[in-house]
Curated annotation (Swiss-Prot):
Chain spans, region RCL: 367-386
Name the record gives this protein: Alpha-1-antiproteinase
One GO term of the biological process aspect: response to cytokine
Biological source species: Mus caroli (Ryukyu mouse)
Family: Belongs to the serpin family.
Signal peptide from the UniProt entry: 1-24
Gene: Serpina1
Domain notes: The reactive center loop (RCL) extends out from the body of the protein and directs binding to the target protease. The protease cleaves the serpin at the reactive site within the RCL, establishing a covalent linkage between the carboxyl group of the serpin reactive site and the serine hydroxyl of the protease. The resulting inactive serpin-protease complex is highly stable.
Compartments, as annotated in UniProt: Secreted
Keywords, alphabetical: Glycoprotein, Phosphoprotein, Protease inhibitor, Secreted, Serine protease inhibitor, Signal
Gene Ontology CC entries for this record: extracellular space
Amino acid sequence: MTPSISWGLLLLAGLFCLVPSFLAEDVQETDTSRRDSVPASHDTPYNLELSISLYRELGHKSTTSNIFFSQVSIATAFAMLSLGEKGDTHTQILEGLQFNLTQTSEADIHKAFQHLLQTLNRPDSELQLSTGNGSLLNNDLKLVEKFLEEAKNNYHSEVFSVNFAESEEAKKVINDFVEKGTQGKIAEAVKDPDEDTVFALANYILFKGKWKKPFDPKHTEEAEFHVDTVTTVKVPMMTLTGMLDVHHCSTLSSWVLLMDYLGNRTAVFLLPDDGKMQHLEQTLNKELISKFLLNRHRRLAQVHLPRLSLSGNYTLNTLMSHLGITRIFNNGADLSGITEENAPLKLSKAADKAVLTMDETGTEAAAATVLQAVPMSMPPILNFNKPFIFIIVEEHTQSPLFVGKVVDPTRK
């Protein structure tokens, strides 16, 4: 085996969020039980701070493009990878993922990932959320037993033997794994594995959620969306009127809307005041998001939200380097804890692919028309007809499942 073997990590986040059907809520409902069930954010390995850091790095690349990624997939894959790292490479990964190694032990980090993956994969009749990890190893190599055992126990990783010299065969194994896990939503996760690849790591997450309060398709109409000061596009705009979690945050100069799914998932939408998107992006922090989730502001309001179909496809090498994770991508990487063969490995490629669909489809809401007629005077109106940010969160752990920015909803 040659002394310079590249390890191709294919970090493939298959996120499919189907957002139909809000079941009607009684307007007298309170949020006490919901608030009491949310733990402190430090209990989660997928912290909000990392989501914001990743978002800002992607935002720096372009201010005119939609953004959509899964922090869950990115963090899971790199944390799992750290099981086979040693020395500075190992430390860089965990610190780059925003862990304070003086306060949290490595064992606790991996146990926290184990707990979160168990939480996310727990059967729930109200929504579908599943994740998966696959380790694909060249057929002439063997994984270190300790790495294999810890990856399986903490990250539920499946292991596949692949002949990477046959690129079509390797591509099919990887794509079949991701396509099956995402129920066909991501059919081609990878086009051509690098020719020197001997090990690949594939990760996916599938999420299908239904709104607690459904949008009535009868009220969806074509409307204008202002991409910028000179560009306007036509989009299908959904409308909902009722008791909603809505308030204006003066710190962010933005309106905040929280929309719950059936099950313990919540979407946080952030609509900046005119000209305040940059201020929102620079000021947003984990403390504010946590506060929004804990302190609800229910009021009568009307919301106009565009129907969405987004995707994100990113090469993570540069992105993660900006977070301080550099050694793993060069010849100084120490990944000797992965394979038994004494061959130097480095990470040749890391990629993230995510898909989102957000619409009003689903069960009919019998009380939707009644809610439309509730106000005696016009309620506050939130019109998401200009660029906005959204974060979908697992509430028990305050773990961000994915983050997005909508600049132009007509771009997929």
